[in-house]
Amino acid sequence: MPSISININLAFAAALLGMLMFRSHMMSSLLCLEGMMLSMFTLSTLIILNLQLTMSFTMPILLLVFAACEAAIGLALLVTVSNNYGLDYIQNLNLLQC
């Protein structure tokens, strides 16, 4: 178990590092965010199954629901920004403009 959890934590750290490095492009940020959610889902599932926490079996499913909602909202925002501006480069956008 420790080597698996270390690998999952490293995957989360790599996705977080990717989010920090490629924050100027929306598509890269969304992919890194999905990687972070996937590693959180995997780690929470392994912890719940190893500790046999019967009351928490629905937590990974709830995490997947939130990840799906986040992905849908992110893709809708990506399509809107791409249609309006022609690219997903975040630094060229002035989001405070009405």
From Swiss-Prot:
Belongs to the complex I subunit 4L family. The keyword Metal-binding does not apply. It catalyses: a ubiquinone + NADH + 5 H(+)(in) = a ubiquinol + NAD(+) + 4 H(+)(out). It comes from Microcebus mamiratra. The chain crosses the membrane at residues 2-22, 29-49, 61-81. It is a multi-pass membrane protein. The lineage of its organism: Eukaryota, Metazoa, Chordata, Craniata, Vertebrata. The gene is MT-ND4L. Its EC number is 7.1.1.2. One of its GO terms (cellular component) is mitochondrial inner membrane. Pfam families: Oxidored_q2. Keywords: Electron transport, Membrane, Mitochondrion, Mitochondrion inner membrane, NAD, Respiratory chain, Translocase, Transmembrane, Transmembrane helix, Transport, Ubiquinone. One of its GO terms (molecular function) is NADH dehydrogenase (ubiquinone) activity. This is NADH-ubiquinone oxidoreductase chain 4L. Core subunit of the mitochondrial membrane respiratory chain NADH dehydrogenase (Complex I) which catalyzes electron transfer from NADH through the respiratory chain, using ubiquinone as an electron acceptor. Part of the enzyme membrane arm which is embedded in the lipid bilayer and involved in proton translocation. InterPro entries: NADH_UbQ_OxRdtase_chain4L/K, NUOK/Mnh_C1-like. It comes from the Eukaryota.
